[in-house]
Amino acid sequence: MTRDDRVSNLKFGGISCHCPTAIMKLSVVLFVAASCLLAGAQVQATYKDGKGTTHWEQHELDTAISPDERERLVETMVKAHQIVDKERSKQRRYSPKDTYAPVNVPCPPMPEGDNYVGFVRNATNQSLNPNEAAYVKRHRQNNKRRWADWLKRAGMDDNGVPGGVDSFLSDERNQPRVGFAASGGGYRAMLVALGVAQGFDERNKTAMDRGVGGLLQLADYFAGLSGGSWATGSMAINDWPTMQSLVDDVMDLSSNLIKPSDDKFSFYKDLFNDVSDKKDAGYPVSISDYWSRALSYQLLNKTDHSPMFVHHGQRTTYSDIVNTTSFKDASYPLPIVLSIGRPPNEIMINPNATYFEFTPFEFGTWQPYLQAFFPVGYLGSDMRLSLIHISE
């Protein structure tokens, strides 16, 4: 199976030893594509000073949050950060476990195949990851009978399908290829993507009555960028619940992400603690860590309110998706999260910027000057010549 087979899916359904190893946090993956959204919003909302430093326009800041609210929020952040620094200066946790910080794990077995150089997969031949190809093949085999039922419900048995649906699908090459593509746009894009997924869900009676229900389960891929990736990741890591139950029982959308209504101090204290864990483990941190960790409170497993925020979503990794029941059964589309590369300090995204993708199996890009992939579960590992470097 090649990349062309996968791309055709998205075009068809474009709806819109111990080694120092970093376990990729799902919250970080949910963030990586958000730069596109932020960059688009900054076109008319920023200016550069004489030194070339970019600043927000004051009226944009005041629109997002009033000066008084901003001052109180900064005071809360500073207080939480000071307490975290004070506590951590007394007792550092050099080997955090089951936290947001990356951890050391046994070295994985070396991938097998002629197109692997160490742990890096050479994708110049445009072939898919063997695990991805196997998943999609099993998913399509599981859905052969369901495709026949769906096409018959759509009235295509005696109208438009030569020889009838059953005869047409007897050749596996005729089985339709469908993929969903969710655009960026923050929470709006996320909710639209969830609404679209619900509209094609076989568990939705209205969708079944209208003849479109079941297409979600039949699709081979569900890809998302920026806000669309928040929906994609949340659906997949939570084992594809109904969209209504995901919003009602898992997500916490009633609380503001920046100034939560429940307990601002606990929120920021836990946020600073988790990111500090990663820093203490020897890994670089950035604003991406704070933003993605904040997103995880709302989009991953249900928040533990006793105490508020603590441990919520911090242990979840993107590669955990492969352990869900739906993924093991290959009963839902393979999720793909997309992101766009952007150099430091660059505001506008270059039209020729590199697109990267994250699947539950690997991370990388198809663009010609790279065309390489790496196991997503070990992102952050110190690599030397395609091999994991073991620090002395």
Task: Label every PLM stretch briefly.
Residues 23-43:
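Fungal secretory targeting signals
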Residues 36-37, 41-114:
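Intrinsically disordered, low-structural-confidence terminal and linker regions
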Residues 92-96, 100-167:
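Extreme N-terminal leader/targeting segments of oxidoreductases
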